[in-house]
Regions:
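Anionic, Ser/Thr-rich low-complexity intrinsically disordered regions
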Residues: 1-142
């Protein structure tokens, strides 16, 4: 098992795009646009690997001074509930702290709220629709 930073455009990045498509986009009938993927060049990309196989991923993007947004978190379907997501979030939080960020925010799908609450995140604001499904803003001070 290894947690590591992924380089945009690498073989690992291609695995990351494929995993996010399978878990986050395909069920909604959506695709990634080339423009969306190009914007990810400036994001911090993270993966959870078992040997060379990507089992989970997420990314951080700076949104304001001292704040990053956790985005595009995905874990292989059959491996959810085994600690991969938790390990990824903790890894991302540690990288954010090392880079002197003070807060992490996210647009969490309603179904994932209990998971993030266990990791110390709290909801902020009202529910809204994003990519056709209900979300809520969650945040955590680092």
């Amino acid at each position: 098992m290894a947690l590591k930073t992924i380089i945009h455009g690498s073989k690992e990045y291609e695995q990351m795009v494929a995993l996010r498509y399978q878990i986050l986009r395909k069920p909604l009938g959506l695709e990634f646009s080339p423009e969306e993927l190009e914007k990810e060049k400036n994001n911090l990309l993270f993966g959870f690997f078992e040997e060379d196989s990507l089992e989970g991923c997420c990314m951080l993007v700076e949104t304001a001074k001292g704040t990053v947004r956790l985005r595009q978190m995905a874990v292989v379907s059959g491996l959810q509930g085994k600690g991969i997501g938790r390990a990824l979030v903790i890894f991302a939080e540690n990288v954010a702290r090392d880079r002197r960020f003070k807060k992490i925010i996210m647009h969490a799908r309603k179904a994932s709220i209990p998971f993030f609450e266990k990791l110390g995140y709290h909801t902020s604001g009202e529910e809204f629709i994003e990519l056709t499904i209900p979300h809520v803003v969650m945040e955590k001070e680092l």
